[in-house]
Amino acid sequence: MSRYRGPRLRIVRRLGDLPGLTRKAARRSYPPGQHGQARRKRSEYAIRLEEKQKLRFNYGLSERQLVRYVKKARRMQGSTGTNLLQLLEMRLDNLVFRLGFAPTIPGARQLVNHGHVTVNGRVVDIASYNCRPGEVIGVRQREASRKLVTANLEYPGLANVPVHLDFDKNKLEAKVTGACEREWVALQINELLVVEYYSRKV
């Protein structure tokens, strides 16, 4: 299953607020489609599937990518759900978004892919790059890049920069000081349901 490129508000109406996907809010609170307002009791599978879809659409992942992250989270020590969220939060495109360099994760991915972002002073154009504590995320030293990011910082997607990012707004760079704490994950998600969804699949 490839990365979603369709109407974003349609997804927000179905799954709820997804800060990484779009900062627009749906006008209608019920899902799209002819039977969107019908009230049916959802199965446990449907509830788990919905949580999984929230994670996938918020971080802009393909199904294959998400499965890979779930497998990696299982091999790590500690809670699989917490590990999964930390892995996704430490992706370069997500950190660029959390710093306010771009209004959404798709916007951040474009910044990275177009060579506007550096890690430890070197251009990194891989959005899925896994950032580690001690690394410094910055903006390329050229006028076009800095102008673009400065404009985006006027209207950041989220109000607060997480505590694991030591951000210097004047230099347009941030040092990663550690892994993301659970309370700083912006997405409203029950990660245990995501782990349960994949428990029999991978």
Swiss-Prot record:
Residues 90-154 form the S4 RNA-binding domain. Residues 23-42 are annotated as: Disordered. Pfam families: Ribosomal_S4 (PF00163), S4 (PF01479). GO terms for biological process: ribosomal small subunit biogenesis; translation. Gene3D superfamilies: Ribosomal Protein S4 Delta 41, Chain A, domain 1, RNA-binding S4 domain. GO terms for cellular component: small ribosomal subunit. Keywords: Ribonucleoprotein, Ribosomal protein, RNA-binding, rRNA-binding. SUPFAM superfamilies: Alpha-L RNA-binding motif. Belongs to the universal ribosomal protein uS4 family. One of the primary rRNA binding proteins, it binds directly to 16S rRNA where it nucleates assembly of the body of the 30S subunit. This is Small ribosomal subunit protein uS4. It comes from Synechococcus elongatus (strain ATCC 33912 / PCC 7942 / FACHB-805). The gene is rpsD.
